[in-house]
Amino acid sequence: MSGTDKVRVNVSQTAQTPLHTSAKLPKVGVLLVNLGTPDGTSYGPMRRYLAEFLSDRRVIEWSRLIWYPILYGIVLNTRPRRSGRLYDRIWNHENNESPLRTYTRAQGEKLAKALSDQPNVVVDWAMRYGQPSIESITDRLLQQGCERIVIFPLYPQYSATTTATVNDKFFEALMKKRFMPAIRTVPSYEAEPVYIDALARSVEKHLATLSFKPEVILTSYHGIPKSYSDKGDPYRQQCLETTRLLRERLGLGEDEMRATFQSRFGPEEWLQPYTDETVKELAKNGVKSVAVLNPGFVADCLETVDEIGNEAAEEFLENGGENFSHIPCLNDSEEGMKVIETLVRRELLGWV
C-alpha cells in the first residue's frame, strides 16, 4: 500500500468519528421579575423597602446632594408608618405577604408547569426591590447549571424606571460572576395581540358580573415624572397605544375609555391626566358609573387594590358618583398566563 493510500484510509476513519458522542441541551433559566414588596408592614421592613426603592437612580433622578437629605431626613422617617398602614389593608395575612408576592409566585409556578414539556428549562421569580432578590435568584439559576437565561421584566410598557432598572440589577449581579451566561431580555409588549386580547377578555368578564354598565372606563397606569418623558422615555406613548388598541378591540369611543396616570410622588409634574383628579371631575360632571383597570400592572398590588379599589372609589362616590368598580389585573388567570407563556416561548426559540 502506498503512502497516499494510507493517508486516505486515515482521513476516512477520522471523518466517521463524531466530534461529540452525545448532544445535551444546556439548561435555560427563565426569570420573571416584578417591582417588589416589603417583607412586612411594620416600620423596619417598610423603611428597608422604601430605602432601596427610592435610592434607585433610575427612579429618582435628582442629584444625590439634594435628594438624600430629603430621603433620609424626612421621607424615611415619616413614610414607612403611613405606607405600612396602607399595606396592612391589603396584606395577605394568611401567608404573611403582599398580594404582589402571592401572585408573582403563582405566575412562576404556573409558567413552570406550562413549560414542563421543555425539561431543560428552569423557571424562577424575583423582585427588583425586596425579596427574593434578583441577585439571589440569579445565583440559584447558575447553581442549577443554567448556561442561558431569559429575563422577563413584568412590565407591558417600557420605562427606564421599571424595565431598565430590572435589567441593570440583573447585569450588576452577573458582574460578580466569573461565568457569564447567554442572555435574552423580554421587550415591552404594549401592542402584542395576545396581551390586548387578554385585557379585553378580562374587561368583558368583569363587566358581565356588574349590576350596572360603566359610562366611562379608565385605564389607569402608574405615572412617571413628565421630565422623564420629555427626555425620551417612551412610556407615555406605549400606555396610550395600549389604551387605543384596547378601546378598538372593545368597540368603545374615546369618551368611553380614557387613559390616566396615578401614584404621583413629590413636587414634580407627572404624566397627566391624573387618575384621582379625573374620577373626581367625572363625578362632578354628572357621570354616575365608572370602572377602572390597570393595564400596566400584571398583578394586583397596593397601587391597584388600595389606591384604585379604595381611594379612587371613595373620591368618585364622595363627589356624586354612584357606581364604581375596579377591574382586577390579569394576575395568574388563564388569560394572564397565556400572555406570559406566549412571550417566553418566543424568546426561547432556538434555545430549546
Curated annotation (Swiss-Prot):
Pathway of action: Porphyrin-containing compound metabolism; protoheme biosynthesis; protoheme from protoporphyrin-IX: step 1/1
Keyword hit for Cytoplasm: yes
Example GO biological process: heme biosynthetic process
Substrates-to-products reaction catalysed: heme b + 2 H(+) = protoporphyrin IX + Fe(2+)
GO terms of molecular function: ferrochelatase activity; metal ion binding
UniProt-listed HAMAP family: Ferrochelatase
PROSITE patterns the record matches: FERROCHELATASE
Species annotation: Brucella ovis (strain ATCC 25840 / 63/290 / NCTC 10512)
Protein's name in the database: Ferrochelatase
Keywords: Cytoplasm, Heme biosynthesis, Iron, Lyase, Metal-binding, Porphyrin biosynthesis
UniProt family annotation: Belongs to the ferrochelatase family.
SUPFAM superfamilies xref list: Chelatase
Gene: hemH
Biological function: Catalyzes the ferrous insertion into protoporphyrin IX.
Record CDD domains: Ferrochelatase_C (cd00419), Ferrochelatase_N (cd03411)
Location in or out of the cell: Cytoplasm
Binding residue positions for Fe cation: H222, E303
